[in-house]
Amino acid sequence: MAQHTVYFPDAFLTQMREAMPSTLSFDDFLAACQRPLRRSIRVNTLKISVADFLQLTAPYGWTLTPIPWCEEGFWIERDNEDALPLGSTAEHLSGLFYIQEASSMLPVAALFADGNAPQRVMDVAAAPGSKTTQISARMNNEGAILANEFSASRVKVLHANISRCGISNVALTHFDGRVFGAAVPEMFDAILLDAPCSGEGVVRKDPDALKNWSPESNQEIAATQRELIDSAFHALRPGGTLVYSTCTLNQEENEAVCLWLKETYPDAVEFLPLGDLFPGANKALTEEGFLHVFPQIYDCEGFFVARLRKTQAIPALPAPKYKVGNFPFSPVKDREAGQIRQAATGVGLNWDENLRLWQRDKELWLFPVGIEALIGKVRFSRLGIKLAETHNKGYRWQHEAVIALASPDNMNAFELTPQEAEEWYRGRDVYPQAAPVADDVLVTFQHQPIGLAKRIGSRLKNSYPRELVRDGKLFTGNA
């Protein structure tokens, strides 16, 4: 694999020499950092099983190497990466997999280790959505996830990825993560804090990642991380699990943050060792039971993961002084909900008791039941999935609902050819050789729902959202 030149400040190299255990070679560390990062993907098991995905993609000649800590994760090698970007493949467009760095799959593996099955989870720093979507798949779209993102510009990306993967059990918020301890104390069974960090572990992906690095900035970042983990710990219920992770390598932002929490709440913090998380995990194990992953150990990004249990309640923080404002939705009454469900079933949309119907003016939404306890405590950017808009002639079903709820075995499903599917993703109407009979057509490709179309004569009117329309070369190889 080709080398690339990474910029290393001298003070960083000194710090790494001190931080690296004697069992590891510093020369191996430098050599690993100069190698470009291996690409990796995670199969979205909400859409397809790993076995079916491997069968579907077998003709492509992809080399898929299993990632030891994630059953759905694979390192991927492709001969035609330049000819067709991974993100333009049909399987990516329909949400069958997520392009995710291998080591970033570790925190969610830790969160669900030892049979942990949380029902209400918070992802404190969620964008772009790799870990939120991984959590949802582990929960099988049940329970509820609060996915928070402080950066306004990244909330839109977070929602796009959640929608593409067919996820229905997520509520999005846009806050500084330090508010949650006071706003929603002891509300979560599990919390993932993948903390903002100095990014020392990402040099294989970004050779200039350390251009603005300094020991002083590490100290400032660590101070913020302590405030974030303190807030998250308050939001965790007694008995709950907190996973703290970063993509950096210094101890100040990693071990020291977790040790600070234990010193602050000595009777309430228990470190849960991760040495048995996967075969070979002990190679990265610290004396506290954390995983400090230097890039040469597993040939991946540098990463840090700690798992903690809250063994008892801690003193509450002062209640927040802000007002959340009125919640603009109201529950749909049972009789009307039955009518809506019947109409939705007619176009192939079905949901279970984990989701409940709510209404705002002419909009119909499905919210995860597990999030209702948070209504009035935080303001949501987006909640659940938008099912439909009502109009005089019935319902205008929404694309995100089709992707999350549609059954490809429904009688109104219509399978497109590769050329027709590509036209669909380009936002164009489709003219199939044999037009379907139904007026409302569930459009599928590779037996996966990709949208809902109106049949007008021999034409299928495209309803693919404009913001998702793709240009350039797609999976048939035509530009």
Swiss-Prot record:
Binding site for S-adenosyl-L-methionine: 125-131, 149, 176, 194
Any one GO cellular component localisation term in the record: cytoplasm
Known catalytic reactions: cytidine(1407) in 16S rRNA + S-adenosyl-L-methionine = 5-methylcytidine(1407) in 16S rRNA + S-adenosyl-L-homocysteine + H(+)
CDD domains, sorted: AdoMet_MTases (cd02440)
Active-site positions on this chain: 247
Protein location: Cytoplasm
Keyword entries, A-Z: Cytoplasm, Methyltransferase, RNA-binding, rRNA processing, S-adenosyl-L-methionine, Transferase
GO BP of this protein: rRNA base methylation
A GO molecular-function annotation: RNA binding
Enzyme class label: transferase
Principal place of residence: cytoplasm
EC annotation from Swiss-Prot or TrEMBL: 2.1.1.178
Pfam families: Methyltr_RsmB-F, Methyltr_RsmF_N, Methyltranf_PUA, YebU_pre-PUA_dom
Keyword 4Fe-4S included in the entry's annotation: no
Annotated function: Specifically methylates the cytosine at position 1407 (m5C1407) of 16S rRNA.
Family: Belongs to the class I-like SAM-binding methyltransferase superfamily. RsmB/NOP family.
Name of protein: Ribosomal RNA small subunit methyltransferase F
Provenance organism: Escherichia coli (strain K12)
